[in-house]
Structure formats: C-alpha cells, structure tokens
Amino acid sequence: MAAKLVGRLAVPVILTMAAGAICLGVSACSSDAGSIAAQARSGDGKGYVSGDGTIERLAPDQRSSPLTLSGTTLAGTAWKVADAKNRVLVLNVWGQWCGPCVAEMPHLQQVWSQLSAAGRPVQFMGVNYRDGVQTAQAFLRANKITYPSLQDDGGRTLLSLRGKANTTPTTLVLDRQGRIAARVSGPVSAATLSALVSDVLSEGG
C-alpha cells in the first residue's frame, strides 16, 4: 500500500518506524508549542503556524482509536464524527484569514465534487478556526464551497483532534471507523487528496 501511494504522489519518503507512519515531504512530522492546538489549550489565538505540506500516512494496524470530535455546523446543525460512520471522512482545519487555506479551498472543492458526483461513500467537513459564523459563511458562499464546516468554538473542537492539527491548514483523512488514516500539514493539492482518499476507500469496511 505504501509503495503504491509513494508512486502516485512522487515525493521523497521519510520512514518514521517508531510512530508506525509514513511521512512524505521535506520535514519530519512533528508538533510545535506554537501550534493551533497549543493555542486552543491556552486560549491564545494571536497567529497561526503554516505547514509545509508534509504528508503522514498510517497503516490500519497503527491507527489510534476513533476520534470523538463534535460541534455545530455553520448552518446551526449538531454534528459528530460518528455521523459519518461507514464513510471515509475528510476533515479540513481552515480560516478565511489564512492565505494557504484560501489557496487550497478550490482543490478540496474539486475532490469533493468529483467524489460526491460518483456516489462514493465519502464526507467532507471543514473545521473553522477563529472566524465568526457570518464571516465564514460569506467566504464559503463567495468561493462556491459546497461541503459543510463546523463553527469555531474557541478551539475546543481542535482539542478533540489530539494534537493532529498543528498547522493551518491541516487536512485529516479518517477511515470508515473514524480513525486517522492520513494527515497533510499545510496546503493539499487535489491530486494528493484524491490519492489519499482513494487508498483509504480501497481498504473496504
């Protein structure tokens, strides 16, 4: 599976055996004391940490327990990860004030449109950070983003991601059990996201 993914993405590989993960990119997967998760814990929302596009992929037997993330969508609907049971879930942490987030949005929308049109068992959910509801809604409408997003709740939702959202943007691909199967720290391209989602879909139930 790993060799198949590497060939598709055509980027350098760093094996992190202790973590049971495959990190693809120019730097190792790591946490940062100034990360948005750390800011969420401290209540400090002064800035953000921008990632370099590092990709981490976890084999099925190396994945942790399902996420318990929950929140309220920008439309006011309660939502939780368990609602996406038996579907591959893509979570994207974003803010309209974040340049890399804005740049990657069309790529996320492209993949979402293609997968939903094909009837694939996939759900996308944005996780907004630091925007008011009206500001976030206006941004999504202006950019024709059709998948939903959770409201910012002062960073509490980010804490449910267990330190996996260390940069803005961060994209997580969860398997059908709600476990993190892949992470992109920084902007993600349509080709990369499509490849990651396809690999998780190919695992079956």
Mark where each language-model region is.
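Short active-site neighborhood of thiol/selenol oxidoreductases, capturing the structured segment around
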Residues: W79-V102, L108
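A short beta-strand-turn-helix
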Residues: A59-L89
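Structural microenvironment flanking redox-active thiols in thiol-disulfide oxidoreductases
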Residues: V102-N143, R156-S160
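Short, ordered coil/turn segments that flank beta-strands lining enzyme active or ligand-binding pockets
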Residues: S27, L74, R176
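N-terminal targeting signals for export/organelle localization
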Residues: M1-T68, G204-G205
